[in-house]
Amino acid sequence: MTSGIGLGDNGGMTIATPERYAQMLDAARRGGYAYPAINVTSTQTLNAALQGFAEAESDGIIQVSVGGAAYFSGQRVNDRVTGSLAFAAFAHEVAAKYPNITIALHTDHCAKQYLDEWVRPLLAHEAEQVKRGEEPTFQSHMWDGSTVPLEENLDIASELLEKSVKAHTVLEIEIGAVGGEEDGHSAEINDKLYSTPAQGITVAQRLGLGERGRYMAAFTFGNVHGAYKPGVVKLRPELLDEIQTTVALAIKAGEMPDPAHSLDVAPGKPFALVFHGGSGSAPEEIAQAVSYGVVKMNIDTDTQYAFSRAVAGHMFSNYDSVLKIDGEVGNKKLCFRLRTVSGESFMLGSGDRPYSLITFTDTIPDTLSSRCGSAMVATYTGILPLLRIID
């Protein structure tokens, strides 16, 4: 499970440098595997994701959505840049305690209406960091142009790609629409969920294949956000192969310039691809998509359910104790403090009390990290070529 790239290239820090992230993505495309990109919404879920990666001994990506970024800043502040920087600061500090893995930080699904208040300011912040000789806070950002016409999508992508080069970050784009709902941004389940080889050619012509800046492309092949009954989601992973092959043949025929030598990284796979909306997908569909150049696979719905099950399980198992905090009499002050101090709940009593958030919250990282790890374990049992650590 090695790629020949040595750990420790980033000076011992667990968060990837730009160079390290580029190595990770190239190694995945060349080796036929993908990194899980786990969405988190709190320090609890962030810790759980780190724990899951460490236990599986897998490098990976941790990301926040538009709602997650705002939530990290607090309900009253409600600022996505503040929340993103708070998330990243916590991640940098805690991830350093996991020296056996490398983690990249990513912002997920930034639609057009959020660009000016989220990704553009973050890219400007990171460009200033680079000017000072520092590493950027994040390693990649996603521009979600799936709701605008392709021409406008690529106009904005071109602008953001130029900014990403200055920020030493990677851009992720989405071509086509992913069905279902993601942070209030939704699309119907219909034929628009399928990208085309012609769109692949257009993307390569407009954005290049690495010579103008590094990017990942989420071409859609029937992907749907959320969890659905079997048969509702009709994935066509072979579309990814058609897109890759069409562009690769154009390069070989001299019809498409390739100054960055994208085919040298992985023959027949000029694009580094992203898999969105994978919850409920069959293992063979995931394996097929990864074999066609997927290097990043988003995981959100699955882990949200793992989190909520742990919460519900504790509450229902300790129903009377949770409601009757002090014998038969509820203590409103104590209830309030439990809600506001959260992780500082050790101040309120011993961890063996059912209503203590120590008991309550300690069940969440184990449950959630186990769910994160279960996807990673698939690689090592030979079910899916999905994840791999670079060592």
Predicted ranges, named:
Residues 4-9, 290-391:
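C-terminal alpha-helical cap/extension of soluble enzyme domains
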Residues 85, 105, 369:
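Glycine-rich oxoanion-binding loops at beta->alpha junctions
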Residues 19-27, 43-78, 82-100, 112-269, ...:
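Alpha/beta enzyme core
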